[in-house]
Regions:
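Cap/lid segment of the alpha/beta-hydrolase catalytic domain
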Residues: 258-283, 294-394
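C-terminal subdomain of alpha/beta-hydrolase-fold enzymes, centered on the catalytic histidine
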Residues: 367-370, 424, 428-615
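C-terminal motif of bacterial Sec signal peptides marking the signal peptidase cleavage site
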Residues: 9-10
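A conserved hydrophobic secondary-structure block that centers on an alpha-helix together
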Residues: 127-162, 278-320, 324
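Acidic, low-complexity Ser/Thr/Gly/Pro-rich repeat segments typical of extracellular/periplasmic
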Residues: 13-258
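Alpha/beta-hydrolase fold nucleophile elbow
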Residues: 394-409
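Short, solvent-exposed loop/turn and secondary-structure capping segments
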Residues: 87-91, 112-115, 147-150, 162-173, ...
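Short glycine-enriched nucleophile-adjacent loop
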Residues: 406-407, 412-423, 429, 527
Length: 615
């Protein structure tokens, strides 16, 4: 034991030392900017490399990224057992005297010095995938790291011996000093002495939103927007609305041949970073027009985005509780197209299998973003000039000044990514059965259609005592690859934090059923937390982020209850329905009234109202 470490740490005879060298993936801290090739993660020593075909595509994609994950674990290995009783709670980790810290050290970030709350897990024994004495630390769900930003994770001498080789990086002549100098400066800012740092790693996150920013800008500023006006085909009529069918062309940014089963499906940029359009999808749409007198300026309209397995007719057919009926009662028209690979945009395959494409991670990373860009395009199409349809000599007009959004499940997931790009075009958005944090979904999803947990543990030959959780390296790899499509990385830009592109704070109502087996309720709660949206009263359960922020029990009715980044007020919140599952807005009358009121008030050029409800 080094005398220096003894003096710094007091009675430290039982403290372990960090492992900082060796041939294994975990024998050095991960992630680290010293473990990259041309700025891209080096996964060449990932456990069991080449042994499992399921992971091969994820490894290849991971090594193509321009940085590390924003919601992924950070790993430190030690030569003995850590005193875990001294490791911090999430709340304690936000203090500069915590034994483990995660801090923004980016010189160009306005949030440099910000401590991110963390959760941790300690693996004491060796498994097929993890060595003994492995500490995994990650941001609390709902606190995603920002893209293209440098962070540091720190373990102090309170729980581990100081590593003499690592501490040499503080010297200006050390070859890695430039990598760690921003951390050294930030520690000085936080009044944390460098000799209290047992081990640390610095890493730069990937550009999670760059592709979406570029393509959304292309849609809104460069792409020719087609004229939607046309003679509609007859659909069907109910006591509340008439449904019609038409045709639309949608820009396709995914390159390759559908359904992208084993290859293709990615976005392509030119040398200047501009998106390359692959082509146009010609597809059907459904529009429903309420019974009654058409307003002078046309019908206020909701763009509907359906769930996995649905199509452009879903919102208008199936029961009396469909959105077309319920919104027609409020004098609102609804329009929708099929998701990518669904309905007439498919290729005869199961859309669920290839929408969540674990065999071809490149397509899995872009499929839902293509869906989000479809909705950005629809918003542009509907608000730039509206639409004037005809049917048997009758004019059916949609008002371009009054457009809102409703997405359920798959449609909520794509909507969560589209909201930051809607700007002031859309008056408000409702997201039903929508979650963030792919790692949570991989661990907690419990639907009968697909057992993702067994697929992972069986295929990767987990030991009987190996735990599959969000700290596991297999989940880390998938989450890192999927950051660009994870709604959790978009939520801060709904209304809480100003983005770098032109936008406006958005009023957003989220709903969840606590019996949901498709979208884990935990994932919905962390998505709300990431956006800065409060839990509406009555609150039935919380995630850790709500415990830290205190954004709970928001009274209703709630109108303009949160101030956005530009000083404007928005109406936001998450409504919970404890006795409902994935389809709360279709089966619970209180949930129905909630979204009816929210959307109708938003389209009346008023602040959207989140009405009182009894779940």
């Amino acid at each position: 034991m080094h005398l220096t470490a003894l003096l710094l740490s007091g009675c430290t005879v039982n403290l372990p030392a960090p492992v900082t060298s060796g041939d294994g993936f975990f024998d050095r801290p991960w992630p680290s900017d010293t473990r990259t090739i041309d700025g891209r993660p080096d996964l060449s020593d990932f456990p069991h490399l080449g042994e499992y075909s399921l992971l091969s595509g994820f490894i290849e994609l991971g090594e193509s990224l321009d940085g590390f994950g924003t919601n992924t674990p950070i790993y430190f290995r030690f030569d003995g057992t850590l005193p875990t009783g001294k490791l911090p709670s999430p709340e304690q980790s936000m203090q500069a005297d915590a034994a483990v810290m995660l801090v923004n050290i980016d010189r160009d970030s306005p949030r440099r010095g910000e401590l991110i709350p963390v959760e941790w897990a300690f693996q004491e024994t060796t498994t097929n995938w993890q060595p003994e004495n492995l500490l995994a630390v990650r941001p609390v769900w709902g606190y995603p790291l920002e893209g293209s930003t440098t962070y540091a994770a720190i373990v102090t001498t309170e729980v581990a011996l100081l590593d003499e080789d690592f501490s040499a990086v503080w010297a200006a002549d050390h070859p890695d000093h430039a990598t760690y100098e921003p951390l050294q400066e930030t520690l000085f800012q936080l009044k944390v002495p460098v000799d209290s740092v047992a081990i640390a790693t610095t890493f730069t996150t990937q550009d999670t939103l760059g592709d979406m920013v570029a393509i959304a800008a292309s849609i809104q500023q460069q792409l020719p927007i087609p004229i939607l006006d046309q003679e509609l085909e007859a659909g069907f009529t109910t006591g509340s609305f008439s449904a019609y069918f038409g045709e639309i062309v949608v820009p396709m940014w995914q390159h390759g041949e559908k359904p992208y089963a084993t290859e293709g499906g990615g976005f392509v940029m030119d040398d200047a970073g501009n998106p390359i359009l692959y082509g146009w999808d010609r597809t059907a749409f459904t529009v429903t027009i309420p019974v009654g007198t058409q307003p002078d300026d046309g019908w206020p309209t909701v763009i509907y985005s359906h769930g996995t397995g649905g199509d452009h007719t879903t919102f208008a057919s199936g029961s009396t509780n469909v959105p077309a009926t319920l919104l027609a009662q409020e004098g609102i028209a609804v329009i929708g197209i099929s998701q990518p690979l669904h309905g007439d945009r498919g290729s005869g395959v199961n859309p669920a299998l290839y929408s969540f494409n674990y065999i071809n991670p490149e397509a899995g990373r872009t499929m839902f973003r293509q869906g989000a860009l479809d909705q950005v395009f629809m918003a542009e199409l509907m608000t730039r000039r509206g639409a004037v349809f005809t049917f048997e000599g009758q004019e059916l007009r949609l008002d371009p000044e009054r457009v809102a959004y409703l997405g359920h499940s798959h449609g909520g997931e794509v909507g969560a990514k589209a909201v930051p790009f809607f700007g002031d075009r859309i008056k408000g958005a409702v997201l039903s059965g929508t979650g963030g944090g792919l790692g949570i979904t991989l661990i907690e999803r419990n639907a009968d259609d697909f057992d993702i947990q067994s697929l992972i543990t069986d295929t990767l030959e987990f030991d009987s005592d190996e735990v599959l959780d969000t700290f596991h390296p297999a989940i880390m790899l998938v989450q890192m690859d999927a950051e660009a499509t994870d709604p959790i990385n978009y939520a801060r830009y709904w209304h809480r934090q100003q983005p770098t592109w032109e936008s406006a704070p958005m009023s957003v109502l989220l709903t969840e059923g606590l019996l949901d087996v498709n979208t884990p309720p935990h994932s919905t709660e962390v998505l709300a937390g990431a956006s800065g949206s409060p839990m509406l009263a009555p609150t039935a359960q919380l995630a850790t982020i709500q415990e830290l922020t205190g954004l709970v029990e928001e009274p209703t009715p709630a109108i303009s209850n949160v101030t956005g980044w530009d000083g404007s007020d928005v109406s936001v919140g998450l409504a919970q329905f404890p006795d409902d599952g994935h389809f709360a807005i279709f089966r619970n009358y209180e949930a129905v009234q909630l979204y009816q009121t929210f959307l109708s008030t938003a389209l009346e050029d008023e602040a959207p109202e989140i009405s009182s409800f009894t779940p």
